[in-house]
Amino acid sequence: YLSINSSHVSELLKILLSIFAILALIIAGYVGYVYLSYHREADNQALTIQSSSSSKDLQTAQDYQIMTYNIGYAAYPPDYSFFMDGGTESRAFSKQNVKHNLQEIQGVIQEHQPDFAFFQEVDKKATRSYNIDEVAALSQNFSDYSSVYGQNYNSAYLFYPITQPIGKSQSGLVTFS
């Protein structure tokens, strides 16, 4: 037979309410952090062109090869399944994996030798790609091209999915010509 007196119940309720209040404060603090750090990228921004010394004028009577490539922040080997597409992954498998994928991406570009190349989901600094500056990596490899980077995504640290948060992301589009 278990005897519970009202002072024990009162003490237990205080502990449970304290735990609930602490959790509520943590959640409210995080929501406030995400909300206060949010800012929409401005429309019609003036972007800086990084000019190459080998720039040349376009000719109207010449064919040009154009390439577009969503590099998926260099995290997508064939067995990768992104969580927002119904998969399980939110980050690259490893920093080494991002570096390897960047080399593979650069190999594809060099194989095709486009006159113009447009890339999406290129991380400048992001948890999901282990803070590798992919814009700098691509720019160094294609130094004979002029380039323009336009940031279109800059998020606070996102604790989603819970098991492996996507983290903080600064990402955009880069064009080489």
Question: Where are the model-predicted features located?
Answer:
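N-terminal, active-site-proximal structural segment of metallo-dependent hydrolase catalytic domains
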Residues: 4, 8-141, 149-170
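A substrate-binding/cap region within the structured catalytic cores of diverse enzymes
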Residues: 170-172, 177
